[in-house]
């Protein structure tokens, strides 16, 4: 385990040496995701606790799986040398330009609802780690692609929120997995203004919004995400192409694909909100 920049382990309470000692000899049991957290349940020799390596990409992080002789990746912060079940060597490389992301070893705890910890956890059906979640991610609710996503609970939360619907969509304790890009796209598809109070949405409109979120996230996953530069790639280092499907985000000044009116960008919470002023009117 090579650590080039200790800042990438800032959420690991034991420091660099503890991270290295825990990972050396550990066996990766699976890969699980909830929202923007990704974790690898571990079997650590001599360790009775259920542990996992937890990763968060922050704004610019990447987790790449490389062959040992592959060219060095710029801005690599951590390298974990692996041996596959077939005896082949590989490298897990954590790359992060802005160092907002992190890796950490965290203890696993039972999920609140007794169901699998997150998306893809089902591949290990019957495994001891299946219904566990890292303590660092326990406060994050399920995302709309999760098989155990509780739509009724989210709709009930909407009814209690007077905040703008975009702010609610980005609240990881209401639902997870939605960033600025996909929030703008879901709101455009649903004809909703970003500042429309969540509580004013009818049940039908709220359900329509959640369904649009699901469809957009599913398509984005299928197309490898939205890659605008070298910071956004999959585990094999390949760029996604969902950017060609965008209707609102980054389309400032271009005609709306629905009505032809120019897409507008408003400054919002230190970022931007992209919307059609004709299709997405604020209704009071």
Where are these regions (language model features)?
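Intrinsically disordered, low-complexity regions
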Residues: 16, 40, 47, 62, ...
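Intrinsically disordered, low-complexity regions enriched in small/polar residues
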Residues: 21, 39-41, 66, 94-96, ...
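A cross-family signal for N-terminal binding/gating loops and helix N-caps
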Residues: 1-103, 255, 271-284
């Amino acid at each position: 385990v090579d650590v080039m920049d200790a800042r990438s382990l800032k959420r690991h309470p034991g420091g660099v040496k503890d991270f290295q000692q825990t990972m050396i000899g550990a066996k990766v049991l699976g890969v699980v995701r909830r929202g923007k957290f990704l974790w690898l349940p571990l079997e650590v020799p001599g360790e009775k606790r259920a542990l996992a390596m937890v990763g968060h990409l922050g704004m610019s992080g990447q987790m790449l799986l490389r062959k040992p002789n592959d060219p060095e990746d710029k801005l690599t912060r951590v390298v974990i040398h692996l041996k596959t079940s077939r005896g082949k060597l590989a490298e897990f490389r954590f790359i992060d330009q802005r160092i907002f992301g992190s890796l950490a070893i965290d203890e696993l705890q039972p999920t609140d609802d007794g169901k699998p910890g997150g998306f893809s956890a089902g591949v290990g059906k019957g495994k001891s780690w299946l219904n566990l979640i890292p303590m660092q991610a326990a406060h994050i609710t399920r995302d709309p692609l999760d098989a155990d996503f509780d739509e009724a609970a989210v709709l009930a939360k909407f009814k209690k929120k007077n905040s703008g619907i975009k702010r609610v969509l980005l609240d990881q304790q209401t639902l997870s997995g939605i960033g600025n890009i996909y929030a703008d796209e879901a709101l455009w598809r649903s004809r909703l203004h970003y500042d429309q109070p969540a509580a004013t949405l009818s049940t039908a409109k709220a359900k329509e919004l959640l369904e649009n979120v699901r469809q957009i996230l599913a398509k984005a996953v299928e197309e490898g995400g939205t890659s605008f530069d070298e910071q956004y790639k999959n585990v094999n280092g390949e760029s996604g192409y969902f950017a060609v499907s965008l209707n609102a985000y980054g389309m400032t000044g271009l005609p709306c694909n629905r009505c032809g009116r120019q897409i507008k960008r408003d400054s919002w919470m230190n970022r931007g909100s992209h919307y059609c002023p004709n299709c997405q009117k604020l209704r009071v």
